[in-house]
Amino acid sequence: NVGIGTTAPSSKAILDLTSTTKGLLLPRMTTTQRDAITSPDAGLIIYNTTSNKLNFYNGSAWEVVTSL
């Protein structure tokens, strides 16, 4: 596991980000750029700058994250 901002990352996480002043910035792209990804893996997440929404690939189609 990898820790960023921590010397003791959680053993339950592959990536543990710790900060009280910064956030996580996901890859940002347009719908056209998103659709150009060949064979995306299920679970892939991007921030769509065309719609200003989070998108994830469900294994067969892109969907909008509607509620967190």
Put a short name on every predicted segment:
Residues 7-10, 29-31, 50-53, 59-61:
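Acidic glycine-/aspartate-rich tracts in secreted/extracellular proteins
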Residues 3-5, 43, 59:
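Glycine-centered flexibility sites
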